[in-house]
Amino acid sequence: MKYILIIGDGMADNPVERLGGRTPLQAANIPTINFMAARGTVGHVVTCPKPYPAGSEIAILSIMGCDPRKYFNGRSPMEAAASGIHLQHGDVAYRCNIIGLEDSDAPYDELKIVSHSAGSIAGEDALEVVRILQEDPEFSAAMQAAGMVIYPHPVFRQIVVQANGDVDGLKLIPPHDHLGEAAGQHMPSGNDNAAVIDNLMRLAHKVLKDHPFNQARRAAGKIPANGIWLWAYGMATELPSFEGQYGHTGGVISGVALVHGIGALRGLEMIQVPGATGEIDTNFEGKMQATVDLLRTDADFCCLHLEAPDECTHNGDLPGKIQAIEWLDSRLIKPIFEQLDTDGTDYRVLLISDHKTLTATRGHDGDPVPFLLYEKGKDTGFGGVFNEDTGMAGPEVPAGHDLLEYLFGTKSV
């Protein structure tokens, strides 16, 4: 038996007026998912227990079998683990987004956060932004004085590590939760280190806003990459062995460092797929084949994560969100099943949205999310479809960190 955990990041939503009161899941054409739903079990679960905010760092840690109340120590250490960055005692890791602020000569505090990702900047463009900052004497000196180092990545998601960083009382705000709002309303606060981070963010804008790199982006009709935003700090994190907890081995397939990092800290293989971007242009076929190839080995577990529905929602792209959900069905799940069926492989599936990402706000929501359990060749007689309404009408799993026990069959709904 093979076990497949499929996470459609942020695909659950609330009813959308533009869709006639339907959710994107209800509007999407997902025949393979609904085939599973009709023969499986559809229920609901809270993946982000209070008092934690709704976010993938809590939700996916929970879905992957770790109670966040026991194991969560910040988002960025898990992202750092995906890059092989090992935090020392006293080190603090931060997520550092390359962002797009309003293209205006207004004071920094009045500039609106236009894009949490500078228009999904990636590749050499993302690396160039980091190079520009590192080569600027004033910014470089401020980083050195703060005891900070930035680790470049070819996406908008960067990692900054600070030696002996003071996070007692520090408050940092996720930029994707405040799109369209003035930056000055959400700057770091809470302690002296907040002023250090505040200064770095303002310096970055000063360096980047009129740089020839951004002049070229404007000329090309792209969102200027004219700022950075530090958030999601955390200290060194240790997670229990996945094999030790469940007796299963396998890997994680994702275009997002957070998910790979959680897998790595649990002793799972991080499977890198070329072109897996964490956006709707991700390499669907590569991720699909990597899943099949993994399950053709002695490994019996695969976590397949698709970030695209979440990013489309943050970007205000409702058609893109629906398209991403449909491609999850047609370009990932359907061909995976076809190849496993040809191989004669038995499999069980857990499909879930890690959290809701709301079209109305372009932000996350901590309401219960639907999940689907399916086993090849079995028929529960449910006869329904997979969406938020059928999930809420179905059984409740008490805690997100128990979900994998239902996938592995050690618990039943």
Language-model segment annotations:
Residues 1-413:
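Feature captures the catalytic ectodomains and active-site-proximal regions of enzymes
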